[in-house]
């Protein structure tokens, strides 16, 4: 496979709007009760289905800069007011650790993923490696979708896992991405760092609205 950037193709073709469309999808098409419960981590193992990498096609941005700039403060304040278990500042510290990443932008198309770290870009074609269901002490569950880079010459993460509160084929509106080079099993133990990505077309204000209302 020739090494060419996914992003120009996505941007020129306007395909990155597919990610924005996924964002809009959650507004335009009401979720079923099962989808709502799955998003909350409540689902039966038998309802989890395989998914293709195309569910995450598009251009995505890390939300870490928005947290660092203070733009996500309304979200932290809302969480503190609603849950009462942490102050807004404690939530901010929790999410600072969770969102931490050096991958500021991701492009996905035709099973190829580009990882942008500033001016540095690494890419690889990824193969599906199944899904895993994690069970938490709270009684909630998480479905992670596993993919692997088989190109030994690539500097992209060898193992990745998507988690987006969806358990069956559906376009993602945002996602958490676990990345590493050790093994899928090692990533499954990663619970406190979950780099989070929203469509590149969304502003900080858009992301705040999405987090508060969806």
Q: Which ranges hold each PLM region?
A:
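Bacterial N-terminal signal peptides that target proteins for export
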Residues: 1-7
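Short, functionally important structural connectors and interaction interfaces within domains
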Residues: 7-8, 40
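Bacterial N-terminal signal peptides
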Residues: 8-15
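Surface-exposed beta-strand edges and their flanking turn/coil or helix-capping segments
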Residues: 16, 75, 128-130, 138-141, ...
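Amphipathic/hydrophobic helical signal segments and adjacent flexible N-terminal regions
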Residues: 19-87, 167-214
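Contiguous, well-ordered beta-strand patches that form the walls/edges
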Residues: 91-160, 164-166
């Amino acid at each position: 496979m020739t090494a060419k950037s996914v992003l120009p193709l996505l941007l020129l073709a306007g395909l990155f709007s597919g990610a924005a469309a996924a964002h809009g999808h959650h507004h335009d098409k009401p979720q079923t009760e099962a989808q709502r419960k799955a998003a909350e981590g409540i689902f039966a193992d038998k309802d989890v289905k395989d998914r293709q990498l195309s569910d995450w096609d598009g251009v995505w941005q890390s939300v870490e800069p928005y947290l660092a700039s203070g733009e996500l403060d309304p979200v932290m304040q809302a969480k503190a007011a609603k849950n009462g278990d942490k102050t807004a500042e404690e939530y901010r510290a929790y999410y600072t650790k969770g969102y931490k990443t050096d991958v500021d932008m991701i492009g996905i198309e035709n099973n190829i993923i580009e990882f942008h770290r500033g001016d540095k870009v690494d890419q690889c074609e990824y193969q599906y490696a199944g899904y895993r269901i994690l069970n938490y002490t709270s009684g909630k569950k998480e479905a992670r979708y596993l993919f692997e880079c088989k190109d030994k010459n690539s500097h992209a993460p060898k193992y990745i896992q998507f988690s987006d509160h969806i358990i069956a084929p559906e376009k993602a509106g945002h996602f958490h991405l676990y990345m590493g080079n050790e093994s899928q099993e090692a990533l499954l133990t990663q619970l406190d760092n979950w780099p989070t990505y929203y469509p590149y077309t969304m502003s900080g204000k858009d992301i705040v609205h999405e987090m508060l209302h969806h």
